[in-house]
């Protein structure tokens, strides 16, 4: 079996991934900007956000790798980075976020999503790496990955999957560790309503794949 790097050399993505390699249409840019402004106001007034360590972020591209407690986590991380919502993509479960055309269209208006199969296979992971590479090569863009693979119920850290480390090594980009504090109290897994409360994002030192 070929290594991931060998498989990537001549890998061609299907047309369904074209959205990752081009500038979003005007409607998408407007929706992302409106969503970003809404989030800025929301996390200033209702769930005040504190940011620690933003100056540690390296030049793009990089992988922002964080614990995962809530559906609000991606917005928190993008705001903490401060480079704009369109400069990030999130890894998203293919069987949930991409199995419905309406859901896929709606969510991609607000954020960039890269599909990945929950069940690992060499072929599906090569496809994911190729899609990620295309996105990261288009302007100053970065990736958000949650190494636990799911949201925590109580804020406790779960076991890590190896995916983020493989992406960093195969694409030659650093991992920036981050820790989100408080989001599991504001919007816990399984709840519809968001509770008011403070949240904080701690950003750590980047880790380079050759270190």
Per-region residue spans from a language model:
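N-terminal short leaders/motifs
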Residues: 1-16, 147-159
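Serine/threonine-rich low-complexity intrinsically disordered regions
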Residues: 1-3, 24-25, 121, 208-209
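A transmembrane-helix-recognition feature enriched in membrane-embedded lipid enzymes
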Residues: 3-52, 100-113
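Soluble catalytic domains of membrane acyltransferases
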Residues: 45-211
